[in-house]
Design a protein with these regions (language model features):
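N-terminal signal peptide c-region/cleavage motif recognized by signal peptidases
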Residues: 14-18
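Bacterial N-terminal signal peptides
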Residues: 7-13
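Heptad-repeat coiled-coil alpha-helices
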Residues: 92-95, 99, 106, 135, ...
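A cross-kingdom marker for long, charged
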Residues: 190-238
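N-terminal Sec/ER secretory leader and immediately downstream segment
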Residues: 19-123
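Positively charged n-region of N-terminal signal peptides that target proteins for export
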Residues: 1-7
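Extended amphipathic alpha-helical interaction segments
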Residues: 113-203
Length: 238
C-alpha cells in the first residue's frame, strides 16, 4: 500500500527523475511562460524570448540571424508545449491513482470507510505540492526547479502520515466487522481482510506501473531535448 501511495506522490517530481531510473538532465532553471514571452532563468543565466523570436540573454539584446531566430522560436514552442503536457500528465496520473485506491477501499472495506476521507485529503495535499513545482497562474505556468527536492521530501512525509491513519482506520473498521460477524478468531479475520486489501492494492499498482514508467521516460526525453535546444541556442550567441 505504501509503495502505491508513494508512487502517486512521486509523480509530482517527474521533471527530475521517476521510478527506478535517473534522468541524465536535472533542471537548473526556472521556466516562466506567459503570452508575451518565455523566460528561462537560473543557474544557466537569464534568457528571455519574445513570440517573434527576439531575445535577450543576461540583459543583453542580440541581433539574430534567420537561423538563430528559428532556433529561438523552436525552443520557445517546445517549452510552451512540453510544460503543460508534463503538468497535465502528472495530475491525471495522481487522479487515476486516487480513483483506483478509492474503488479498492469501497470494495474491500465499504463506501462509508473513513479511509475515503483520508485519501481525499492526501489527494488535495499532493496537488498542492504539484503546484509548487509547476505553478498554474492566470496568464500561464511557472516551473520552479528548486522546489523539486523539497516537494519530494514533503511528499514522502505526507504519504507516511496518511499511511499511519489509513492503517489505523483499516484495523479499526475491519476489527469492528470481524466482531459483528462473530465466530472464529476476530484477529485472524482482521489479518485476512488486511491481506485482501494489500493484495488488491498491489495488483492495481502492477496495472499502473508500466504507465508511470513510460511517462517518466517520456518526460525525461523531453527535458533532455529542451536542454539540448537551450544549449545550442545560447552557444550560437557567443
Amino acid at each position: 500500500m505504501r509503495k502505491t501511495l508513494l508512487a502517486v506522490a512521486l509523480s509530482v517530481t517527474t521533471l527530475s527523475a521517476h521510478a527506478d531510473y535517473q534522468c541524465s538532465v536535472t533542471p537548473r532553471d526556472d521556466v516562466i511562460l506567459s503570452p508575451h514571452q518565455v523566460q528561462v532563468t537560473g543557474e544557466n543565466g537569464d534568457l528571455v524570448i519574445k513570440p517573434d523570436g527576439n531575445l535577450t540573454y543576461n540583459g543583453k539584446q542580440y541581433s539574430l540571424s534567420a537561423a538563430q531566430r528559428e532556433q529561438a522560436q523552436d525552443y520557445q514552442a517546445g517549452l510552451r508545449s512540453s510544460l503543460p503536457w508534463i503538468d497535465d500528465g502528472a495530475r491525471s496520473r495522481v487522479e487515476k491513482g486516487r480513483q483506483a485506491l478509492d474503488k479498492i477501499i469501497t470494495e474491500q472495506v465499504g463506501a462509508s470507510s473513513s479511509m475515503h476521507d483520508r485519501l481525499t485529503k492526501l489527494d488535495a495535499q499532493l496537488k498542492t505540492q504539484m503546484n509548487r513545482i509547476i505553478e498554474r497562474r492566470s496568464d500561464g505556468l511557472t516551473f520552479h526547479y528548486k522546489a523539486i527536492d523539497q516537494v519530494r521530501a514533503d511528499g514522502q512525509q505526507l504519504v507516511n502520515q496518511a499511511m499511519g491513519g489509513i492503517l489505523q482506520d483499516s484495523i479499526n473498521e475491519m476489527g469492528a466487522k470481524a466482531v459483528l460477524k462473530g465466530g472464529g478468531n476476530p484477529l485472524q479475520g482482521i489479518l485476512g481482510s488486511l491481506g485482501g486489501l494489500q493484495t488488491a492494492i498491489q495488483e492495481e499498482w502492477k496495472n499502473q506501473e508500466a504507465d508511470f514508467q513510460k511517462f517518466g521516460k517520456d518526460v525525461c526525453s523531453r527535458v533532455v531535448s529542451l536542454e539540448d535546444s537551450r544549449k545550442a541556442l545560447v552557444s550560437s550567441l557567443k
